């Protein structure tokens, strides 16, 4: 998020190279220092704050990374990479703002706790 990112895409037997800039998606660039987490407790606090609607560089990083994953998963390869990521940004913002991401995280936490409980 501090600068642009080079992305290689493989498809239809071809390799293409793109340059992704957060500014292309109305996401501000941020220094690496704004993205540094901490221990598990601190990272959980940051994640909870993001999913509760707190804005800032950590949320922007989550949105942009989720958008890239969505772009790869959705498979709309007839669109160029920038358009796929732009659609992913919209979906990621919607998931965070609607509470869907927070709800899914709560389900993962619950499942993780169930799986870590010793069975007798």
Report each predicted region and the residues it spans.
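Glycine-rich anion-binding loops and their surrounding alpha/beta cores
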Residues: 1-120
């Amino acid at each position: 998020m501090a600068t642009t990112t080079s992305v290689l895409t493989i498809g239809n037997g071809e390799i293409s190279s793109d340059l992704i800039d957060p500014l292309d998606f109305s996401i501000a660039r941020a220094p690496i220092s704004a993205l540094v987490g901490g221990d598990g407790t601190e990272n959980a606090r940051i994640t909870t704050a993001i999913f509760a609607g707190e804005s800032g560089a950590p949320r922007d990083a989550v949105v942009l990374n989720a958008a890239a994953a969505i772009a790869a998963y959705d498979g709309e390869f007839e669109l160029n990479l920038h358009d796929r990521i732009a659609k992913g940004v919209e979906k990621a913002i919607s998931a965070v703002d609607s509470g869907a991401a927070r709800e899914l995280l709560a389900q993962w936490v619950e499942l993780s706790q169930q799986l870590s409980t010793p069975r007798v």
